[in-house]
């Protein structure tokens, strides 16, 4: 699953796309460690910490596109683990594709978490500083082929209620499976 590492980022302002990247990396640009848990992909870092029954994920972005756009910044997700229900172990899916019969899987790591961050988008006529604080979610995709080879299209979304979040994800694969 680590043969096709990539990072995708989309930034919208009032329903208009301001920035989109889908950066693929050579497998040797992906490194990880268990204690403390972190993954590095190129100049981007993903860290996980558990502090006082709170699960924190922090993403540190440092991206440069061929178009000269640059995105830098930090995003932190914080989840109160006392409100989390148990789910199946996602790592059990990461077997040989022949055994699991899938080429792509979606891992909804934090379906509902507090999020805060600061991003700097440079490359247009202006530099955008984007600060945010609110409610969001965080997911990962994993597969045994480049993600773009797995699907024709996909649809996803979320609805936050007072105590719950509804998240859906539908992928129309190239072999006709939904």
Predicted features and spans:
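Structured soluble/peripheral alpha/beta segments that form catalytic or ligand/cofactor-binding pockets
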Residues: 1-178
């Amino acid at each position: 699953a680590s043969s096709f590492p990539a990072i995708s980022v989309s930034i919208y302002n009032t329903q208009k796309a301001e920035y989109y990247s889908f950066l693929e990396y050579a497998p040797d640009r992906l490194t990880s460690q268990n204690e403390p848990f972190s993954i590095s992909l190129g100049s981007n870092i993903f860290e996980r910490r558990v502090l006082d029954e709170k699960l924190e994920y922090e993403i540190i972005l440092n991206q440069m596109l061929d178009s000269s756009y640059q995105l830098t910044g930090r995003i932190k997700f914080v989840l109160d683990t006392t409100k989390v229900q148990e789910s199946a172990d996602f790592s059990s899916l990461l077997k040989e594709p022949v055994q699991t019969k899938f080429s792509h899987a979606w891992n909804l790591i934090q379906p509902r978490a507090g999020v805060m961050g600061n991003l700097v988008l440079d490359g247009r006529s202006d530099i955008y500083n984007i600060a945010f604080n609110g409610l969001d979610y965080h997911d990962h995709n994993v597969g045994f082929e480049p993600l773009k080879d797995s699907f024709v299209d996909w649809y996803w979304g979320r609805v936050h209620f007072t105590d719950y979040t509804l998240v859906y994800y539908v992928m129309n694969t190239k072999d006709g499976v939904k």
